[in-house]
Regions:
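Oxidoreductase and adenylate-handling cofactor-binding alpha/beta cores
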Residues: 255-270
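S-adenosyl-L-methionine
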Residues: 149-170
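Glycine-rich adenosine-cofactor-binding loop
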Residues: 79-122
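Core catalytic loop region at the nicotinamide-binding pocket of NAD(P)H-dependent oxidoreductases
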Residues: 268-280
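E1/E1-like adenylate-forming module used to activate ubiquitin-like modifiers
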Residues: 2-39, 43, 167-168, 173-174, ...
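Glycine-rich phosphate-binding loop and adjoining beta1-alpha1-beta2 segment
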Residues: 59, 119-155
Length: 294
């Protein structure tokens, strides 16, 4: 942190606390009176005045029960203390295409403070039908770098780390270190199994999804769960289906993945665990089935 020359670190924190107390205002939420709030312009001004990083200002505000205005419509479904928990959470998204791009956007809007993006590929024109991060201007750009730029523009409180590489058995522990949850947004069965083994070794939950045409599937795998081997086995003799990748399916399943990640991070609800959720959007069908005990 680099603040004004005449202020040491302690003084900067004290000055920030006082500024936050002076700036916060009351706001009317969707269900009546909301917590005191602070807006983006005020946060940016504090950043320039005190030299405090913007993510740190968001965190300091939440610690004092002050809700950044951008999160007002998360409240009261997400409490201020839960918003603080999200701000200090670390999520890994492996794959930044049809599933991963939307997961990243949703998590950034929700306020997950640290996002790690893993994807070695570049955008192609055939991605434009469904991949939330792709535009004609992003063609040939790396998905990881594009994700970083989009997310940081969308929410400057989010810190983005990128790995424009393929996840492997050798690098997975480095990438997954200190994360709280990971998302499987891959399209290779073997890569999914490599990721799952990494999350088991790292001791964190994995939220899996896959799509094919109008069909999507979703499951959250905790380290002690049998997980994806119940679906794919070793994966050696399986070939991916080819009914296309539609935007409705990709965005639906991606947001369900983001919801599962939210459950994990906040310890809320009932994760779809040891159970597969399947959706067939054309017929409007949604089912859950449990796997038989091995």
């Amino acid at each position: 942190m680099t603040g004004p020359k005449n202020l040491d670190r302690t003084s900067v924190h004290q000055a920030l606390a006082q500024e936050l107390a002076d700036l916060c205002t009351s706001a009317q939420g969707p269900h009546g009176q909301a917590p005191p709030t602070i807006n983006q312009q005020q946060i940016t001004s504090l950043h320039h005045k005190l030299g405090v990083p913007i993510p740190a200002i968001y965190t300091a505000a939440l610690e004092k029960g002050i809700l950044p205005l951008r999160y007002l419509r998360n409240y009261p479904a997400i409490s201020v203390s839960e918003q603080m928990k999200l701000a200090t959470s670390r999520a890994v998204v492996v794959g930044a295409g049809g599933l991963g791009g939307q997961i990243l956007i949703t998590l950034a809007r929700m306020g997950v403070g640290q996002l790690i993006v893993v994807d070695p590929s570049r955008f192609e024109e055939s991605n434009l039908n469904r991949q939330a991060l792709s535009t004609p201007l992003s063609l040939a750009m790396t998905k990881a770098h594009t994700a970083q730029s989009v997310v940081e523009d969308l929410n400057p409180a989010v810190e983005v780390t990128i790995h424009p590489v393929r996840l492997t058995a050798k690098n997975r522990m480095h990438i997954l270190a200190d994360a709280h949850v990971a998302a499987d947004a891959l399209d290779s069965i073997q890569d999914r199994l490599i990721l799952e083994q990494g999350t088991k070794e790292a001791g964190i939950p994995l939220v899996h999804a896959a799509i094919d045409g109008f069909f999507g599937q979703l499951m959250t795998v905790y380290p002690q769960d049998p997980g994806l081997t119940r679906i794919y086995g070793s994966g050696d003799d399986l070939q991916p289906s080819s009914h296309g990748n539609l935007p409705m399916t990709a965005l639906t399943m991606a947001n369900l993945q983001a919801m599962e990640m939210l459950k994990v991070l906040l310890g809320r609800g009932r994760p779809i665990r040891n159970t597969m959720l399947t959706m067939e959007l054309e017929e409007g069908l949604m089912e859950q089935f449990s796997f038989p005990q091995p």
